[in-house]
Amino acid sequence: MEEETKVVKKVTGPAKPQKLRSIDVELAQKLNTGSSQTKSSALYKLRSVVKNEKLTEIQLLKIWKGLFLSLYNTDKPIVQEEFSRDISKLTTYFKDYKDSLMFIKCFFIILQKHWDYIDKYRVDKFYSLVRKMLNSSFQILKKRNAQHEEGSEEEEARLALNEQIYSGLVKIFKSTVLNTSSDSTTNTNGVLLHFADIYLEELFKVTQGHMEPINLTKILLPFVNFLTKSEDDVSCKRIKERVFDRLLTTYSPFDKKDAYYLPKVGVSSSTPEIFPTDYEMFSKLFFKCASSKDTLEQNRKTLYGLKNQFKRAQAALEELEELADNIVLDENGDIVENPNVNPEDLQGDDSDDSDEEFDVDQMDSEDSGEGEFDDEIDADDAEELDDDDDEEFDEELDEEDEEEEEEEEEEVPPPPPTKNLKSKPSPVTQKNKQQQQQPPAKPAPITKKQQQSPAKPTQVTKKQQSPAKPTPVTKKQQSPVKPTSPKVVKKPTRK
């Protein structure tokens, strides 16, 4: 009996206290279950934990791992949209904005780490989650942006808080989705490309363009840093087209749309989307980055191009402001004449116009006097042109005579082929030679092939031609030698 009692004591003795699971592990496991009720209850509990407890970065990473797997296994588009919306709303439930920023940072870390596991059938719902999380990130700015009286302590505290939130978001985007270092958590740029596509759209949805130009410049600094240091040409091109080119067209007062703009509901010419952009500041910023020693050589061309684009946009904006100063609208919104214009100024303008008309008449009279002198010059030129026409007419007659001689030479049978001469006598020297000899019998016409033959006895070389320069053959000298009657051609008259 004693042995039996001892055994019973060992079995039925007090159990060791089990180690309690932390709240983050428990929530992650419940979120990863297949039951929709368990997921909804875990999400509701997570909402209360976020409001009342302070979580560390490691705990938030574990929670986001469970949320990622839960969305990965969720089917049906409507259910996916509701689940993504509930997840994104958690960002605004934190009491301290630092915890909200930490929650956003952990989201991008987990998403980039597991992006390679997302296939083409699940990528759309994660794109939707990225859009909603980015919208919630900008909601933090709007939530902390309550206006107070200028110069008050509350207003100064609000400005300091906004400065911290903007700088915090910039650091998160630089270290996660827009990270340019080689030790990045992912080798893909899928998140970055979609992030650049939706950045300005979600920012305008939250702010409606009501933000200071300096804050807009701060919130776009991660993209400028990426263009300066990144070696990814595809991502740099996407950022230029979807962020900065869009800032110069779609979200500008110039009534332009970028090449990738899609029409939206409720957006028209009467309600344009405009950001208060400081184009001059961006131009100086791009110039400073392009001329920096740390900038990659392959990215300088893009940065200098953006610098020139923003500089031209600043000049165009100044022209619009000058035009807007001269426009006055009535109660109905119609354009009316500016009442500040002095009528005496208009009269002064009329007197100036009369003076200009007088000057124009005087200039016309001066031009008419110069015209007579020009007529005299034209008459002298006409005489010179007539002399030139005579010389051209004589040259035409010479060419016709040569053509007739060539036709007669073609009738004679050609001699046997011989070697070609390097030098060829000119037709003018042949005519002079015929005039000097004047044989009693008419010699046979000389063909081109006979002129080229080396066996010709009477051959004129360049040395023989050099001392005695032949005089130009005139029309009278050619007439007695011609075997045929010269053609009579009327001399053209100059009009």
From Swiss-Prot:
Biased composition (Low complexity): 427-452
Listed Acidic residues bias regions: 346-412
Subcellular localization: Nucleus
InterPro entries documented for this protein: RRP1
Key words, A-Z: Nucleus, rRNA processing
Biased composition (Polar residues): 453-478
GO-annotated biological processes: rRNA processing
UniProt key word Endoplasmic reticulum: no
Domain of life: Eukaryota
Region (Disordered): 334-495
Coiled coil: none
GO cellular component, one term: preribosome, small subunit precursor
Family: Belongs to the RRP1 family.
Described purpose of this protein according to its UniProt entry: May be involved in the generation of 28S rRNA.
Protein name: Ribosomal RNA processing protein 1 homolog
Gene that encodes the chain: rrp1
